[in-house]
A protein has these predicted regions:
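N-terminal leader/signal peptides at the extreme start of proteins
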Residues: 1-37
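Intrinsically disordered, low-complexity regions enriched in polar/acidic and amide residues
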Residues: 1-4, 61, 77
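Aromatic-residue hotspot detector
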Residues: 12, 19, 37, 57-60, ...
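Amphipathic alpha-helical segments typified by the pilin-like N-terminal helix
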Residues: 34-74
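Short, well-structured segments within or immediately adjacent to enzyme catalytic domains
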Residues: 72-271
Length: 271
């Protein structure tokens, strides 16, 4: 990782540590020879430490979030592998979404796509992103936050609008998102990408479906149901071909001149 001057941040942090060491050495020498410090000297030292902290803390924070993003991406890669194997076993069909749709946020939770895919990997599929700090995890009701990740609702055979597109119906599997990170507005285990082509109208799929509609932020022209900036301005996505990658949201859709935004990577029928 590099700073704005192109120098590795690890070296930058090391230089900061050396500088702090020099300041500390000077302070100890001053204390031994004079037996004390003046108020101005103490204020100067405090100011130097505050400046260094202001410089280094953002670097440490970014490094911590980068580590969380990598851990989340590892989760996504495992999901991609599991989904790809599931599709091969089920005649190119995709996993079901059987959470609490149509019954409200507190309705009984079905097995869901994560449990359907679990047998295809040796390790436990981790359903929570390290950076997902949604308060819904701690509200005492596990049904209100099923996972940090949602399945693209274009694919499952139990969900509109296509009612079960198969792998053969996906024009470009390497460019079609099947799993995205969910925001607080989606306690369910999937998101409805169908609404993304028209932010002024969100389709409804029955009672209780408002928990996972792809609602739009009219001011920003972007969805509020998917966590599009969870990791340093972007998020991790799983694609139909099984690979997972970090992207900024604007890389996952396209604006058609003279018309509203149209679905790009989220629609399996797009050319």
């Amino acid at each position: 990782m590099e700073n704005s001057q192109g120098k590795p941040r690890t070296m930058f942090c090391a230089e900061g540590g050396l500088f702090l060491g020099a300041v500390r050495s000077t302070i100890f020498k001053k204390w031994r020879t004079s037996g004390g410090f003046t108020l101005i000297e103490l204020l100067v030292v405090i100011a130097i430490i505050a400046i260094l902290a202001a410089i280094l803390f953002p670097v440490f924070s970014q490094a911590r979030e980068k580590a969380r993003s990598i851990s989340c991406l590892s989760n996504c890669r495992q999901m991609g592998i599991a989904i790809a194997m599931y599709v091969q076993d089920w005649d190119e069909g995709f996993p079901l979404t059987e959470p609490h749709e149509y019954g409200g946020a507190h309705a009984p939770v079905g097995p869901g796509w994560l449990k359907s895919c679990q047998p295809y990997v040796k390790t436990q599929l981790l359903h929570r992103c390290p950076s997902d700090s949604s308060p819904l995890w701690n509200d005492g009701d596990p049904k209100t936050r099923v996972a940090s990740y949602g399945l693209n609702a274009y694919f499952p055979p139990d969900h509109p609008p296509y009612w079960g597109v198969t792998l053969g119906g996906v024009v470009n599997p390497a460019r079609c998102v099947i799993v995205a990170e969910l925001a607080d507005q989606v306690p369910d285990d999937h998101f409805v990408a169908a609404a993304w082509g028209n932010p002024t109208k969100v389709p409804e799929f029955g009672p209780g479906s408002e928990e996972h509609e792809a609602e739009w932020d009219d001011a920003r022209w972007e969805p509020r149901s998917v966590a599009i900036r969870r990791h340093l301005g972007g998020a991790n996505y799983v694609f139909v071909d099984g690979h997972a990658k970090w992207h900024r949201f604007e890389q996952t859709w396209q604006q058609t001149p003279g018309s509203p935004p149209t679905v790009d990577w989220y629609d399996p029928k797009m050319p």
